[in-house]
Amino acid sequence: MRYIRLCIISLLATLPLAVHASPQPLEQIKLSESQLSGRVGMIEMDLASGRTLTAWRADERFPMMSTFKVVLCGAVLARVDAGDEQLERKIHYRQQDLVDYSPVSEKHLADGMTVGELCAAAITMSDNSAANLLLATVGGPAGLTAFLRQIGDNVTRLDRWETELNEALPGDARDTTTPASMAATLRKLLTSQRLSARSQRQLLQWMVDDRVAGPLIRSVLPAGWFIADKTGASKRGARGIVALLGPNNKAERIVVIYLRDTPASMAERNQQIAGIGAALIEHWQR
């Protein structure tokens, strides 16, 4: 009997851990939900294989907010690859085309901006008018949603333009995704043949150059680690980030974190996302 018991213990020791068996990150997420009095959705996915490493509420809907801009520029690059668009094409616009928070596009009313410059502004500075101008080139919210369906994402949906899409009403399915769907879509854009290798590199570089994500995962990133990301925010209790991370300056994993329905301040939301990121990184380094 003792021999059988030892054999069973030895066998169990060789079995792989379950997908959700990352205790430290999940404990941090539960703590964050308690401190935020809201919901957290998260997924950590291996970039090469697509395997889920850690997940929490990964199939629940969360507002995309400005994280949609990565998918938007992916759709733009798909049109470039198909010969239907050029990054060098200049787009001219008027004062009435500008919406709240347009730090780059508001400076180019006289000369306009190229499609590539608009993508850079939308991702690196989260410029809302740049996003709307690009959204018009892909057929608006319905056109971007159609692109998502074409690449196999049957969950993510965009219904409105900037800045209304950031409304984040409780229970509202408009302009939402799930952590699992967003991670899978990001992986398709960056690793599959949905985009050319050149377009994949360009999309990733725009995320590397993100200049408005400092208080989140970048604030806890160890020296020598790679990060490329895009954040999103709402005045109504939501916050989010999509990121690629890895040691040795190499992208190895996709991390998607969304918050919703929290009364916490923006600084507190940032701190909680940074804490979740730190827990993931610490667990990774073990």
UniProtKB/Swiss-Prot annotation:
* UniProt-annotated binding residues for substrate: 230-232
Query: Which residues carry out catalysis?
Result: 66 (acyl-ester intermediate), 164 (proton acceptor)
GO BP annotation list: beta-lactam antibiotic catabolic process; response to antibiotic
Leader peptide range in chain numbering: 1-21
- E.C. number: 3.5.2.6
Recorded catalytic reaction(s): these are: a beta-lactam + H2O = a substituted beta-amino acid
The EC class name is hydrolase
Q: Which Pfam families match?
A: Beta-lactamase2
A GO molecular function assigned to this protein is:
beta-lactamase activity
Q: Which UniProt keywords apply?
A: Antibiotic resistance, Disulfide bond, Hydrolase, Plasmid, Signal
Give the Gene3D superfamilies listed for this entry.
Answer: DD-peptidase/beta-lactamase superfamily
**What pairs make up the disulfide bonds?**
73-119
The record makes one more remark, namely: The class A beta-lactamase family has a specific amino-acid numbering system, sometimes called Ambler or ABL numbering and often misspelt as Amber. A multiple sequence alignment was used to derive a consensus sequence and then the consensus was numbered taking into account insertions and deletions. This allows use of identical numbers, e.g. for active site residues, despite differences in protein length. UniProt always uses natural numbering of residues, hence there appear to be differences in numbering between this entry and some papers.
* NCBIfam families assigned to the protein according to its UniProt record, in alphabetical order: bla_class_A, SHV, SHV_LEN_OKP
Family named by the database record: Belongs to the class-A beta-lactamase family.
Question: What is this protein identified as?
Answer: Beta-lactamase SHV-5
Organism, as annotated = Klebsiella pneumoniae
Task: Report which gene this protein is encoded by.
Answer: bla
